[in-house]
Amino acid sequence: MRWLMKFEINGKDFFKDGKSIKIISGAVHYFRNMRETWDDIFKKMKAMGLNCVETYCAWNMHEKQPGVFDFSGNLDIAEFIRTAEKNDLMVIVRPGPYICAEWEFGGLPWWIQKNEDMEIRCSNPIYIKHFENYLSKLFDQVRPFLFTNGGPVIMMQCENEYCYY
């Protein structure tokens, strides 16, 4: 289903196609669940009255080696969003680059620490170059599903728990 909707935030209220809505969301991290279970999970979410699913994206799962990206199998964010859409769920994507989520190194790839000039989670140009490359590849997967393109992705949260370290 393509939603062809207008989504707005006005003050503390959310509006879909001009009508005030409440977002009732649950978190499901696609990379922590088998792809075969996504549809069943979403059906159960709908049965509980939820209308939205929120998911982190773990950079260290998608780019295990510098410049080598994987969006297959349980890492297929596009299929995850497509399955949510099929179940009439809106989607909030939280791509990081840091996600926390009780996930190793907050989802940052291990290799990012190997450069002595690297400073993470700041405006360090080396760090920015790497995470911009990751976000570019990830957004290529997500872009077709943005609400502005008729898809179910209504919001994105970049970074997470900044200044909590």
Give the positions of each predicted feature.
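N-terminal carbohydrate-binding accessory modules
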Residues: 1-52, 82, 86-90
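Active-site region of glycoside hydrolase catalytic domains
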Residues: 8-10, 81-82, 86-165
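Aromatic-residue detector
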Residues: 13, 21-22, 38, 56, ...
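The substrate-binding groove and active-site-proximal loops of carbohydrate-active enzymes
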Residues: 23-35, 59-76, 113-133, 159-165
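Aromatic-lined substrate-binding rim segments of carbohydrate-active enzymes
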Residues: 38-106, 110-112
